């Protein structure tokens, strides 16, 4: 079973559009934070350290597929559950499931996203994908 890490995000008034629901780009900002949180909780060093030690600048997104199930609004507290769904040679699929607890105590799925990400190095001209480091896979398993 894939290792799963959760984090919470309180929705503030400023995160919402005039209708009072979360403005959708904010989900992607929170998913990016959840991605980094996942690697930190699994024991990977901060990107500023990996760039010095290995030349790895981070895990840019190659593709993102998001499905929104219901709305969320300010004062909701979201739980973002993150795992690696699939490891590939030069990429991986990171799944995020975002939920909230209703006033009645039920857990309600708000949205789910699968991101394809790569570990990247800067070769001086551009970012390029590298093979996923085996020790990183081990830390995240």
Swiss-Prot record:
Q: Which PROSITE patterns match?
A: 4HBCOA_THIOESTERASE
What is the regulatory mechanism acting on its activity? Answer: Unaffected by EDTA, Mg(2+), Mn(2+), Fe(2+), Ca(2+), Co(2+) and Zn(2+).
List UniProt keywords, sorted A-Z.
Hydrolase
Instruction: Provide the effect of residue 17 to S.
Output: Drastically reduces catalytic activity
Effect in UniProt of substituting residue 88 to A: No significant effect on catalytic activity or substrate binding
Q: Which reaction does it catalyse?
A: 4-hydroxybenzoyl-CoA + H2O = 4-hydroxybenzoate + CoA + H(+)
Give the residue range of the signal peptide: none
Domain of life assignment: Bacteria
Q: Where is the active site?
A: 17
What does the annotation give as the result of altering residue 17 to E?
Reduces catalytic activity. Little effect on substrate binding
- Residues binding substrate are 47, 59-61, 90
Annotated GO molecular function terms are:
4-hydroxybenzoyl-CoA thioesterase activity
The UniProt entry, under Pfam families, shows:
4HBT_2
- According to its UniProt record, the EC number is 3.1.2.23
Task: Report the pathway entry.
Answer: Xenobiotic degradation; 4-chlorobenzoate degradation; 4-hydroxybenzoate from 4-chlorobenzoate: step 3/3
* Enzyme class, broadest EC rank: hydrolase
**Subunit:** Homotetramer.
- Protein family: Belongs to the 4-hydroxybenzoyl-CoA thioesterase family.
Q: What role does it play?
A: Hydrolyzes 4-hydroxybenzoate-CoA, and to a lesser extent benzoyl-CoA and 4-chlorobenzoate-CoA. Not active against aliphatic acyl-CoA thioesters, including palmitoyl-CoA, hexanoyl-CoA and acetyl-CoA.
What is the protein name for this chain?
Answer: 4-hydroxybenzoyl-CoA thioesterase
Organism of this sequence: Pseudomonas sp. (strain CBS-3)
């Amino acid at each position: 079973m894939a290792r799963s890490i959760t984090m919470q995000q309180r929705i503030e008034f400023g995160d919402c559009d005039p209708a009072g629901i979360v403005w959708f780009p904010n989900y992607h900002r929170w998913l990016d934070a959840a991605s980094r949180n996942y690697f930190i909780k699994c024991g990977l060093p901060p990107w500023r350290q990996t760039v010095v030690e290995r030349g790895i600048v981070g895990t840019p997104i190659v593709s993102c597929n998001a499905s929104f199930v219901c709305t969320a609004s300010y004062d909701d507290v979201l739980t973002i559950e993150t795992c690696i769904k699939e490891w590939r040679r030069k990429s991986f699929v990171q799944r995020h499931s975002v939920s909230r607890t209703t006033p009645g105590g039920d857990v309600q799925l708000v949205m789910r996203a699968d991101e394809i990400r790569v570990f990247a190095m800067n070769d001086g001209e551009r970012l390029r994908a590298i093979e996923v480091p085996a020790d990183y896979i081990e830390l995240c398993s």
